[in-house]
Amino acid sequence: MEKVREIVREGIRVGNEDPRRIIHAFKVGLALVLVSSFYYYQPFGPFTDYFGINAMWAVMTVVVVFEFSVGATLGKGLNRGVATLVAGGLGIGAHQLARLSGATVEPILLVMLVFVQAALSTFVRFFPWVKTKFDYGILIFILTFALISLSGFRDEEIMDLAESRLSTVVIGGVSCILISIFVCPVWAGQDLHSLLASNFDTLSHFLQDFGDEYFEAREKGDYKVVEKRKKNLERYKSVLDSKSDEEALANYAEWEPPHGQFRFRHPWKQYVAVGALLRQCAYRIDALNSYINSDFQIPVDIKKKLETPLRRMSSESGNSMKEMSISLKQMIKSSSSDIHVSNSQAACKSLSTLLKSGILNDVEPLQMISLMTTVSMLIDIVNLTEKISESVHELASAARFKNKMRPTVLYEKSDSGSIGRAMPIDSHEDHHVVTVLHDVDNDRSNNVDDSRGGSSQDSCHHVAIKIVDDNSNHEKHEDGEIHVHTLSNGHLQ
């Protein structure tokens, strides 16, 4: 009885983990009932009489073809259908060729043909691109060719056999595909997209919490806050094992028709490339995490000497990851992550200046080694974050993400004086110029002497706006820092 309870608890856990699994189970049952109805109801009697025992291939096709996602089902269904068609045609050709060779040579030739096609097809399965997308089709090709050829040796109705075999496979495959697409579809492309965005979010949590965990004493802070932070720091490990899932989902997604915001020939391979860079970052984070949990701990007062730049490097890299996650989830082009990447690189330069000042001259060699290893890892993560940002921009361009930007503002002179009002400008460029027009009359009255060498247009000031997204304006100033001015109701704050 305890074993039954355990199975029930496991079933509840699996269902709660992803409710779509329960729906998928019902979809498979529905497909089997639909195909089986050809045998149990009288109106379909001619169907059973025509196909005979081969009609069972329709049921077998449903069992082996129906997969969790639309892409996987389409891939298997098309593989099975095309392989059955090609193998059936070649099997008929092999049968006819063997018959022309005479009764004595016929069985020998058939055996040789089956051996050659099985050997060659099995060898082709080792090709990487075949293994990835067509492995199941090759297996069905080997099976169907052998069945058609050997059955044809003993059965003169070879054409009927091939036709009924192909027809039943098509019936089963089409049933699976239609139910998979039109009944609560599960799109592999959407799952891949969500997985990649989730991985960005996971790594951002580690980098944002790294400073608090590394520079604060372990016993410091509220217990619940500390425990939550530790859980966030451990979440990155899921990214390390995501390669197989990403590659499988990308493979299935290539079979899927356009759906939602995913157009035809969506750049699924670019998702795999971005995922590979994320795993590289996760491996460096794994090494960085080992120093947090190391038995050999550097005194906090020594860490404090480099706290400001290191905190900024990790937090800005984490913020950049967070922005890229939001960009992917909303499928919009946003350069907000570039701002954080630039700030993290500026923090790297500040760290370099700080190290050159000799601030660590009094640190013990062993402590110096551990501290410098942490610094090196963070610098590597900052550089890798820049590569990831570039890769995401390539993905956004290839996938035609929406250029969702807030209206750029143009300040014009108003009737009340020098205070301007916001005017929207239609533009799709990434860089804009805002012209701020002051009250020329007031300027002249206050600066009579300055008006000799210039015209009224000299009082206009141009501010180069680098980014305008849905939450903020980003402005590049002469001090090298990038400042953010939020927008509210179309006005600058």
Swiss-Prot record:
Annotated Basic and acidic residues bias: 441-452
Subcellular compartments: Cell membrane
GO terms for biological process, alphabetical: malate transmembrane transport; monoatomic ion transmembrane transport; response to aluminum ion
Membrane-spanning ranges: 28-48, 51-71, 104-124, 133-153, 169-189
An example Gene Ontology CC term for this record: plasma membrane
Gene induction: Up-regulated by aluminum. Small induction by erbium (Er) and low pH stress, but no induction by cadmium, copper, lanthanum or sodium.
Membrane topology reported for the UniProt record: Multi-pass membrane protein
GO molecular function: malate transmembrane transporter activity
Keyword terms, alphabetized: Cell membrane, Ion channel, Ion transport, Membrane, Phosphoprotein, Transmembrane, Transmembrane helix, Transport
Modification Phosphothreonine occurs at: 385
Keyword Phosphoprotein among UniProt keywords: yes
Activity regulation remarks: Activated by external aluminum.
Function: Malate transporter critical for aluminum tolerance. The STOP1 transcription factor is required for ALMT1 expression.
Note in the entry: Essential factor for aluminum (Al) tolerance but does not represent the major Al tolerance QTL also found on chromosome 1. Acts in parallel but independently of MATE, an aluminum-activated root citrate transporter. A reversible phosphorylation acting both at the transcriptional and post-transcriptional levels is required to activate malate release in response to aluminum.
Family classification: Belongs to the aromatic acid exporter (TC 2.A.85) family.
Annotated protein name in UniProt: Aluminum-activated malate transporter 1
